[in-house]
Each structure stands twice: as structure tokens, then as C-alpha cells.
């Protein structure tokens, strides 16, 4: 997972509340277990509408999604985060996230930045006044800047640290590789051990 400190990218206003994981990626696309190849499935039910925000040319290449409240509710599918990342999003901004979605996001390198609802509406206004405007998201200072306006966002310290260090669950485990090898080296040979890492 790559380290995250700041990100600057085109913002897309998703003016919908209660966007659940089935709307983010319908269940029919969940047959694969790889983390890639889901970009076409993102918001599949809505992308048939030519007026849907991600179909509009001014939001092409958007990497910051600003959504309504209660984003990521529903089933706890990691595929929702995979689809957002595979499409190119690095940040989702909302006034409230489902707990499991927020947890999955941090583990997959997607920043779920929680702001006040009034700030969501301000960002929507700025993006609609200047379609294609870039938002700068600074994880270190926990701020989002757009068109000369800055708003603070909330994120727990642990998830912030993991994102800034670029540590997914495997990366966290590998930080203790020497301890794991020492423990396994001291275990009796008849007990199971992990296989050596492949290069």
C-alpha cells in the first residue's frame, strides 16, 4: 500500500445520502476475490444514466468523491472499497460513514474523511461552480482545501498513522518478521511453521 500524506485531485460531487455498498458495487460483481478489475462495476446501476456525475466530462479522472451522509452502509463487502480504488478514488469525503466501510477503507489505502454536513454542502457548491476544480487533501493537517476555502476533517489517529506509513494488514505483520522468525526458530521442529516469503 502506498503512503498517503497529501492528495490533490479533481473532486466529484455525489449528491446522494445513504449510499450503500450494493449501490457502490452490485452483488453480481462480487464473484472475484482479486482487488482489481472492478472499476466498470463502480456505481453500475447509476452509470447507465448519461447525466450521472461520473459520466460527465468535467469530472473525468476524479479522485476525490464528496458524498452525502451515511456513505458505505449495508453489507460489509471489501469490494466496495476495491471498486472505488480501482476507479481511481483516493479520498471519499462525507459527513458520516458506516463503521465497517470506514475500517475497510483505511486498510486498503482509501481515505474516508469525515466533515460536517455543512462543509459537504460547501464543497458541493464549489465543485458545481467550478466543474473540474481540484481538492487538496492533507492528511497531516487533516484539512481539505478547495477554491481558497479550507475545511477540517476527522480521522482516528491509528488509521491516519497507517495511511501515512502505507501499512495494510500484511505490512503491519511484516514489521514483526524478525520476531516471527525468532519465535518459529525456537519452536520444536514437529510443530507447524510459516513458509518462507517468496521474492
From Swiss-Prot:
GO terms for biological process: L-leucine biosynthetic process. The keyword Amino-acid biosynthesis applies. It comes from the Bacteria. SUPFAM superfamilies: LeuD/IlvD-like. It holds the Pfam family Aconitase_C. Heterodimer of LeuC and LeuD. HAMAP family: LeuD_type1 (MF_01031). Belongs to the LeuD family. LeuD type 1 subfamily. Catalyzes the isomerization between 2-isopropylmalate and 3-isopropylmalate, via the formation of 2-isopropylmaleate. PANTHER family: 3-ISOPROPYLMALATE DEHYDRATASE SMALL SUBUNIT (PTHR43345:SF5), 3-ISOPROPYLMALATE DEHYDRATASE SMALL SUBUNIT 2-RELATED-RELATED (PTHR43345). This is 3-isopropylmalate dehydratase small subunit. The lineage of its organism: Bacteria, Bacillati, Actinomycetota, Actinomycetes, Micrococcales. The gene is leuD.
